[in-house]
Amino acid sequence: MFVVGQRWISESENNLGLGIVTASDNRTVTIQFPAAEEERIYALSVAPLTRVQFQKGDRINSVEGWQLDVEEVVENQGFIIYLGKRADSGEEAVLPEMQLDHKVSFSKPQDRLFSAQIDRSDRFALRYRALQHQQAQFQSPLRGMRGIRASLIPHQLHIAKEVGQRVAPRVLLADEVGLGKTIEAGMILQQQLFSGRVERVLVLVPESLQHQWLVEMLRRFNLKFSLFDEERCSDFDKADEDGNDVSENPFDSEALVIASIDWLESSPNRAKQVLASHWDMLIVDEAHHLAWSEDEPSVGYQFVERLSKQTPAVLLLTATPEQLGQESHFARLALLDADRFYDYHSFIAEQKDYKPVADAVATLLNDKPLSHDEQNSIAELLSEKDTEPMFKVINSEKSKENDRLQVRQELIRELIDRHGTSRVLFRNTRQGVKGFPHRVYHQITLEMPSQYTNALKVMGMMGGVTKDDQLYPERLFQRMNPAAKWADFDPRIEWLITFLKNHRDEKILVICKQADTAIALEQILREREAIRSAVFHEKMSIVERDRASAYFAQMEEGAQVLISSSIGSEGRNFQFASNLVLFNLPDNPDLLEQSIGRLDRIGQKNDIQIHVPCFENSMQMVLATWYHQGLNAFEETCPMGAALFREFGEELEGFLKNPQAVGFDEFLVRTFKRQQQLKAELEQGRDRLLELNSNGGEVAQALAEAIAKEDNNPHLVNFALSLFDVIGLEQEDLGEQSIVISPTGHMLVPDFPGIAEDGTTVTFDRQLALMREDVEFLTWDHPMIRNGIDLITSGYIGKSAISLLINKNLPAGTLLLEAIYMVETQAPKGLNLTRFLPPTPVRILLDNKGNDMAAQVSFAGLEKQLKPLNKQMANKIAKMAQADIKKLIGISEQKIAAKLPELIEKASQDADSTLSAELHRLTSLQAVNKNIRSDEIEALEQQRIESLKQIALANWRLDSLRVIVSNKE
């Protein structure tokens, strides 16, 4: 049976490669596996081995590296010799089986079937379902938005969908604080990455926000960005023996990069390297800090300007236009489209033209009759439409309410499309979005301890008292008395302990200036008072912060209080808590708003209680009073806070240095009066038309509801659990809608992407994921699911199977063939053809006469009737029925070839319809809205042409097959 020199493969250890018989006797056979450098000795009676014999038409590899197209197979004294022509030269050649490549693998399902590499039937089923789900996800309009670890906020989803599906989007995101600009940018980015339009991304942020972006992108979107600074870049600096610079560009080493714009401004060489690298998308946060004037733009602005000109997609995140001032606002728009926004004075004139229209929209929204002037403004802008009948419906008391509503909505839609900046600017306000809680301020006045008073006096006599020393005296005291403990006498500690004991059932966030303060506070609460507490600061790793956050989020056994440094809490939101204690007061209004913003977010269910313990007649008290009575910054968001701080900062400094100085009350009155004036100007400057476009209305609400509906669909849970089971991952149900997934020693793959060695806790529940940042939130967009699908569909799992069909109506031994074909295109990713023709599985189920029964016999229905076969019996069937199986495969190829034109035609119609409609819309709008870029229209037309061309080239391939043999029982 076995002859030395023959080639066999191990059925149980496919990874060993092609074996060669080195010895054989009456009881055993010895096989050498050169590729794996392994040897096995098998008992002849149970040897799990299959003889390798290629067929005419196969292309096989020699051990020397050349390939042979087999034309004839000759057997001589137990050895196989292959005759044919070399693939490289076409010359006739002979290849004895001993000279076959040792690393042979069988990728075609039929080759695997006939070489005894037969998989379990349940794995074949999982593979088919994975292919079906992959197809569905490629075509889902929710892709890139549903997987975010965040609440489903309609206006955010609307902006993300509107911008994320554009070709090379260039927009300004200018929502008010707390409305989620970072989340909007992340969802836009996610969609662009999924579609393949974007691969390399640069995020430029102020230095203080680098870690916030790193955390947000990882925790909310599962995007692993790399933080670049001078230390990291210096590792790439090199010189040759002659001292010539041969450095590599560090920015070419990663695809997703975060860098500080402050650093690049001060480092021309690094800025030059950034410009030399290629980026598909640029995101700039806090873009309003890029100073610009017509005569003297800043270094930072000029750098971003150069970068934006060579980067196709640009997202600028900025303060609201009213906060910026029109000149600064114009400068940001010019970064997005320099051809459109080329002259500031023309821009101002154009904006004035839209003011009457915005007023008219406000009237439409309030369901009031339009004035004569408002009608003229609308008619002028919609000059190509007959608006007179529409105005009659709106202004007539006899009109039906539903008719008035429809006309109002149509007019508003038309006006939005023609709005001056509606395609490049999105801005939502809290007033427009609604759903925010109230904020209630509680000032706690305490007597300053003598230890602090003495320390300030001593340092004052030495001439070394700083503003920080007076605002945060505990740091000064500790610096002067390293052995002493400020917490032993600071009355804020006792107040905090009492407060916590009086609010045992509530979650409380405490924010301090420094990490050391937070650490000391947490230790006292935990050790001295046995209060369940967690600490959160910048010295902790992201994993440690996740654990602290999760401990705080637990409702029953979790921490009552989380004590955080001001930097440590960046990027983290705790909407489930409604009590905020500012142990240290931030020293500017923006930082104050950031701190309150940890709780004051969309999704907060309760009014926010803000507690500020201050020392009487101190700098702390002056600042707190100015924030409250001057800016009203505790109880309302204060978008004009930075402007007021600049305007009154110098005068405020005098009162901070001398808390009892005369004139403070009058100063508060002046500040508040100016605050009210700026607030009124902001309200008057609100562009209701722009807000309406940014908000999304009913369409946005429907989008949120669609994702919520998918959240509750059991298909993902069922598929994921089957996936984990087949791969060999251990699953432990923790209750509370979470499970722990752990690796085992019998997995199909060495490691599964995203699973930690000690296990990973996952949930399919969005609300739990929002509360527990240490738990992975699984959706169809999550890398664990996407990688799992790729693992199944791109490998050999489930490619060939043999099953037993128990059916009394069929003669025993009846042969069926279930073939799964893939119809797909080989097109550039940037075309995003998967929307129209994703890799599409086509199931063909042939009986022994070659009839396709797939339409009559469902996959799920057939699956229930199938029984597994042991491997030995499956191999026997494959060998015995080889000729019949090959015949059925040939028939199935004819069937799929006949189906292909219909699939191509449908995909072509979908692509042409979708892309032509968008093209027509943009072309029509360009005539009435200058913000429709010509290059965007040209790119879309080119995309349409290329898409139709590539879809026409789609082809099929056999992905997997299952042989089914019937039996009576």
UniProtKB/Swiss-Prot annotation:
Keyword list, A-Z: Activator, ATP-binding, DNA-binding, Helicase, Hydrolase, Nucleotide-binding, Transcription, Transcription regulation
GO MF annotation list: ATP binding; DNA binding; helicase activity; hydrolase activity, acting on acid anhydrides
Residues that bind ATP: 175-182
Pfam families (alphabetical): Helicase_C, RapA_C, SNF2-rel_dom, Tudor_1_RapA, Tudor_RapA
Keyword Cell membrane attributed: no
Primary enzyme class: hydrolase
Helicase C-terminal domain: residues covered: 492-663
One GO BP annotation of this record: regulation of DNA-templated transcription
Protein EC: 3.6.4.-
InterPro entries found in the cross-reference section: Helicase_ATP-bd, Helicase_C-like, Helicase_RapA, P-loop_NTPase, RapA_C, SNF2-like_sf, SNF2/RAD54-like_C, SNF2_N
Stretches assigned to the Helicase ATP-binding domain: 162-339
Motif range (DEAH box): 285-288
Family assignment from sequence similarity: Belongs to the SNF2/RAD54 helicase family. RapA subfamily.
Descriptive protein name: RNA polymerase-associated protein RapA
